[in-house]
């Protein structure tokens, strides 16, 4: 069973990389991908959220490791039959505005993930 993901640790890791995404939107995107295609690979997700990554750079390599842990943990959470899942958004100790903004970012990322995964819809 996947453990809850530390929002601040995840946020710091992503900020060290070449991206315009927030950790909340990036996590939402991952969840949207996963809901359509459970065999998603780490590189599929990283290719959508990162412009580039230099694994020879120690800070970027550490951040890559954190993102890989988030990926694996999220996959475990979403596959858990007890539905032990939490979106990566600001926690209860954060100001309400930040909590709301990160929830909005997560939802937007989720919808983008569904769209990029070509989720099938019908008019019926």
Model-derived regions: residue spans:
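Domain-length accessory/inserted modules outside core catalytic folds
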Residues: 1-107, 111-124
């Amino acid at each position: 069973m996947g453990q809850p993901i530390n929002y601040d640790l995840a946020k710091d890791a992503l900020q060290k990389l070449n991206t315009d995404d927030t950790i909340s939107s990036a996590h939402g995107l991952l969840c949207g991908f996963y809901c359509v295609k459970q065999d998603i690979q780490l590189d599929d997700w990283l290719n959508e959220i990162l412009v580039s990554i230099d694994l020879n750079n120690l800070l970027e390599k550490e951040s890559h490791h954190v993102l890989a842990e988030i990926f694996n943990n999220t996959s475990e959470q979403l596959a858990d039959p007890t539905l032990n899942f939490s979106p990566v958004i600001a926690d209860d100790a954060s100001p309400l505005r930040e909590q709301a903004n990160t929830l909005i970012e997560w939802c937007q990322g989720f919808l983008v993930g569904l769209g990029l995964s070509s989720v099938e819809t019908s008019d019926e």
